[in-house]
C-alpha cells in the first residue's frame, strides 16, 4: 500500500494538507519547489524574487556552494551523537559565537524559541543563585509592548500580543509589559523584584521598531544596580542582518544574554543562547538540556555560514545594499502619500502604510508579480531578503511597487518650496 500523497495540483495539495496537518498556519497559495541564489520557483516554474528568505533564515540564499558542501560532507560523516559525547563542532561554533557577540559562553539548541526559553530559565536560575548569596532579587520579567519572543509557554509569556497568549492561559506569571522606548515607565516598573529585562533590539513581528539608545542604556544601568540580567533577543536581527553581527553592536551597551537563531545554520534548525561568565555560572549539569541541540550536522553548517559571511564581506554588503534599499523606499514615500514611514537598518526593513487595506493590496499584488515578502502588524510590509541581494534586484522590486502605488493614488512631486503637490 502506497503512502504517497496523490496530488497533481496546488488545490489538491491544499486539500490534503487541510486533512492531515494541525492547522497552525495560514499559508499563501503558492507551492515552492526549488531555489537558486535569491530566487524561488513554484511548482509551475514561476520565479519569485525572495525578499523574505524564509522569515530571515536563508541569509545566503539558495544553493550556496559553501552551505551545500558543508551539508554534504557532514551528512556523509556524522549527523548526530547526543550531548553525552564530545565532538569538535560544538567547540568550533561556540568559539565563533563568542567572538562575534563579545560574550563568554554558549548553549546550543534547535530554534529561536528554545534559545529564548533557555534565557528565561537562566535569568530565573541566576536570580536564585544571587538570593542564595544573600542578595535581594525576585523572579519578575519586564518585557516590551509589541514584542515577540516565541511560542513556547515561557517565551509566549514575554510576547506582548494578546492573541498569542490568551488561548494558553494562564501563561507564566510574573511578566509586566512596558511601552516601547518609555524610559519613565521602565524606571517606574523596575525594582528588586525584577530578575531580567527582556528586549528585542529591533522588533520584527512588531513592525520593525528600533530600541532607542537611551532606553537600552537605562535598562543596562537598572540591571547593573541589582544584578538583574539584560536579555537581548537577536533571533531576527542578529547574525549580520543589520550590518553588524548583532543589532546591539550599534549601541554602547552589552547584554548579559543574547539569543541567535534564524540564519545561524542557513536553514538547518539551530539556535544559540550566548551569555556572560557571570550569568552562565547559574546553570549546572542537569539543569537544562536538549537532545538535538548542537548536533554535528547543524554545527558544521553554522560554521560554514559564519565563515562565509566573513570571507565574502557580507556585513559590509548588507550595510551598503540595505542603505540603498531604504533610500529607494524613502523615494517612494516622497512620491506616494500611501506610505507613512520607512524603518529599519541593513536588510531588516519595514515599510509602514497609513492603511492596512493598501498594505494588503500591495503585498498580494507584488506576490502575483513574483516578489515574496510579508505583512506584519497589519500596515507594515516586512523585508528580510538574503544578504546576497543586489542593487539591480532592488531596482526591479522598487519599480514594481511604484507601478502598483501609482495605480492607487496620483504620484506626488515637490514644488520649488519643498512642499508636496499632487501631479
Residue ranges and their predicted role:
Residues 2-423:
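Conserved N-terminal phosphate-binding loop of PLP-dependent enzymes in the Aspartate aminotransferase
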Amino acid at each position: 500500500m502506497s503512502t504517497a500523497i496523490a496530488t497533481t495540483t496546488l488545490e489538491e495539495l491544499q486539500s490534503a494538507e487541510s486533512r492531515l496537518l494541525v492547522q497552525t498556519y495560514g499559508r499563501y497559495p503558492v507551492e515552492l519547489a526549488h531555489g537558486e541564489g535569491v530566487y524561488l520557483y513554484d511548482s509551475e516554474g514561476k520565479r519569485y524574487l525572495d525578499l523574505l528568505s524564509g522569515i530571515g533564515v536563508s541569509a545566503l540564499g539558495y544553493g550556496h556552494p559553501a552551505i551545500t558542501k558543508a551539508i554534504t560532507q557532514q551528512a556523509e560523516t556524522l549527523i548526530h551523537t547526543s550531548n553525552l559525547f564530545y565532538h569538535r563542532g560544538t567547540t568550533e561554533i561556540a568559539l565563533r559565537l563568542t567572538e562575534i557577540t563579545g560574550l563568554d559562553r554558549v548553549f546550543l539548541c534547535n530554534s529561536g524559541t528554545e534559545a529564548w526559553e533557555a534565557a528565561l530559565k537562566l535569568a530565573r536560575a541566576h536570580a536564585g543563585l544571587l538570593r542564595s548569596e544573600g542578595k535581594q532579587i525576585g523572579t519578575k520579567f519586564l518585557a516590551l509592548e509589541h514584542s515577540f519572543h516565541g511560542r513556547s509557554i515561557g517565551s509566549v509569556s514575554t510576547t506582548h500580543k494578546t492573541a498569542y497568549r490568551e488561548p494558553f492561559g494562564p501563561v507564566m506569571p510574573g511578566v509586566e509589559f512596558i511601552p516601547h522606548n518609555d524610559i519613565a515607565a521602565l524606571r517606574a516598573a523596575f525594582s528588586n523584584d525584577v530578575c531580567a529585562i527582556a528586549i528585542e533590539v529591533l522588533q520584527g513581528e512588531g513592525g520593525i521598531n528600533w530600541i532607542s539608545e537611551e532606553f537600552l542604556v537605562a535598562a543596562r544601568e537598572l540591571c547593573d544596580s541589582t544584578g538583574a540580567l539584560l536579555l537581548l533577543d537577536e533571533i531576527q536581527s542578529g547574525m549580520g542582518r543589520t550590518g553588524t553581527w548583532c543589532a546591539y553592536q550599534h549601541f554602547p551597551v552589552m547584554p548579559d544574554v543574547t539569543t541567535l537563531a534564524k540564519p545561524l545554520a542557513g536553514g538547518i534548525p539551530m539556535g544559540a543562547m550566548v551569555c556572560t561568565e557571570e550569568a552562565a555560572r547559574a546553570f549546572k549539569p542537569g539543569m537544562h538540556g536538549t537532545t538535538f541541540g548542537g548536533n554535528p550536522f547543524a554545527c558544521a553548517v553554522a560554521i560554514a555560514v559564519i565563515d562565509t559571511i566573513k570571507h565574502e564581506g557580507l556585513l559590509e554588503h548588507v550595510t551598503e545594499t540595505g542603505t540603498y534599499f531604504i533610500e529607494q523606499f524613502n523615494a517612494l514615500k516622497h512620491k506616494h502619500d500611501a506610505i507613512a514611514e520607512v524603518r529599519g537598518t541593513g536588510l531588516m526593513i519595514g515599510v509602514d502604510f497609513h492603511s492596512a487595506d493598501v498594505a494588503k493590496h500591495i503585498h498580494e499584488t507584488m506576490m502575483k508579480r513574483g516578489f515574496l515578502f510579508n505583512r506584519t502588524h497589519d500596515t507594515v510590509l516586512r523585508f528580510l531578503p538574503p544578504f546576497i541581494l543586489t542593487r539591480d534586484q532592488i531596482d526591479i522590486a522598487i519599480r514594481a511597487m511604484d507601478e502598483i502605488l501609482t495605480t492607487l493614488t496620483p504620484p506626488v512631486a515637490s514644488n520649488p518650496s519643498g512642499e508636496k503637490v499632487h501631479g
